[in-house]
Amino acid sequence: MDRCPADAITLNPDHAPQLHTSACTGCTGCVPACPADAIEHEAVSAVSLLQQARQLVMQGQSEINVACNAVTDTHPGLSVHCHASWNPAVLASMAAEGVRILHLEGIDQCNGCPAHHGSSLMQQTEKDYATLNKSLGIQLHISHKAKEIVVEKPLPVAEPEPQRRAFFRSLIPTLTQGAAMAASQIGQAVNQATALEIPEADTEHDSHLPVRLQLFLRALPRLQANFTPMPFMPSLPLGAIQANARCTACNQCVEQCPTKALDIREFGANKILEFQPDACIGCRQCINTCPEDALESLPGISLPSVLTQRARPLIMVHEDMLKKEPDRSDRPELKEDD
């Protein structure tokens, strides 16, 4: 709801999002905003966009033009429904693929476009991406101008050559064609080997994460993450929590976590509450449901801790603090006549 600039999304009495089509402009800005991938649009696919970007980079293009639907005469490159559909996770993933400059063609035409909100929503996305880049070494630059088309100048007319030199030069097209064919075959093999598929769950946690976040986590090892804490951003839902001594290992947070980021394991007579950094989306359900107020969210997250992909202990709950089951031994047994 906060992402929609047209106020076209509200919550119904069951607390489920409801779209008011009369107010919706179709900018698709809500699609990347949902941390659960609950909102979809056929024209928005992070996987398809990254796949196309990878192909262009493999062809030697690190400077890519992306046109929206407002552009009628587009330059060669990629296309999106509206520039409102961008999010920091996809931008970072494109940087990991080798994209260095992203030209957003048509972003200056939003006022006359039915979608209308591409430019305003992209401004917030760029701010979030700039914040994310403080924690990354590899990043791309965003341009609001279309990529310039370089017109190759015609080659000067060559002077007549000696007969022997002309013979060997005549072999060049044949050799070039053979090399191009070999390169094409190699390229096709590489493309097939590196084709970007919809992420399959590597772990139990991955299956509960939004696709764009899975793509970002897979790109993260190539982005040179540093230890600058990244604040929580709804556009890139990565969260972190900590526990205090009031924890009784009651298991309610584990049961409520939609991404299985929390778990409790036994350690002798004690129990340990564990946290999986790469599975938390910062939804705060665990915090809101904790009966002891033993959990709180951290203001930032360290991306290298996410790279470890290992659960870390939050707190050890000693035996005397464990939530006990009600003792029914002293209750009188009910007789059938009762």
Describe the role of every protein-language-model region.
Residues 29-152, 285-338:
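Flanking helices and flexible, charged tails adjoining ferredoxin-like Fe-S electron-transfer domains
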Residues 99, 256-266:
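A contiguous binding-surface segment within folded domains or other stable secondary-structure elements
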Residues 14, 263-277, 302-305, 310:
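Ferredoxin-type iron-sulfur electron-transfer modules in oxidoreductases and energy-metabolism complexes
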Residues 1-3, 61-69, 73, 149-260, ...:
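Ferredoxin-type iron-sulfur electron-transfer modules and their immediate structural context
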Residues 11-17, 226-241, 266-268, 272:
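Short Cys/His-rich Zn2+-coordinating modules
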Residues 1-7, 18-37, 242-260, 274-293:
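Cysteine-centered iron-sulfur cluster-binding motifs in ferredoxin-type domains/subunits
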